[in-house]
Amino acid sequence: MNIRILFLGEIVGRPGLQAIKENLKNLKKRCNINYVIANGEGATGGFGIGKNHAIQLLKMGVDLITTGEKTFFKKEMVDYISTNSKIIRPANYPVGTPGRGIKISEINGIKVAFITLLGNSNFPRTHLANPYIGATNIIEKLKNECQAICVQFHATTTAEKQTMAYHLDGKVAAVIGTHSKVLTADERIMPLKTATITDNGRCGSD
């Protein structure tokens, strides 16, 4: 059985939320989408995501909200992310960080794992484990539990994101780069059948 997963670029502020409100329902219907992921870390004015905007996105049809280095820019997210499994933060944050970095969902009978990882370059206020080693370790644990694995890699440099794509080629279904808010025109299927794009852009404007 085939499934269709829609991964929306970073939702930025009010324009991004409005774009989702006006278009997501029809897009899901037109493209027969089974599951919707959105990078929501810029939903609240471009700087983090607050509880109310997270709730709003989920009500508008988003199934899973991912984040990046701005996960905890809004203090209320420290508590809220621990109680809502539909929001994930980078899996390579330090042990003990509130929330989770992995979400396993059953979509039309197929178990799919979604992982978010954060790159090491140019995020000075974060203390991160190596995302490449982290990805390998997580995938090793999940490979017998899930039929597909999708990775969001939130990183500043093209080199980091393309390295992750090659590192995981053949091990996961997709590696989706985020952070720059600029859609790249390099979507492709890697030699070992992993789908990837360096950056999937944004919804709205910053």
List the predicted regions and their residue ranges.
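Acidic, metal/ion-coordinating pockets
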Residues: 1-206
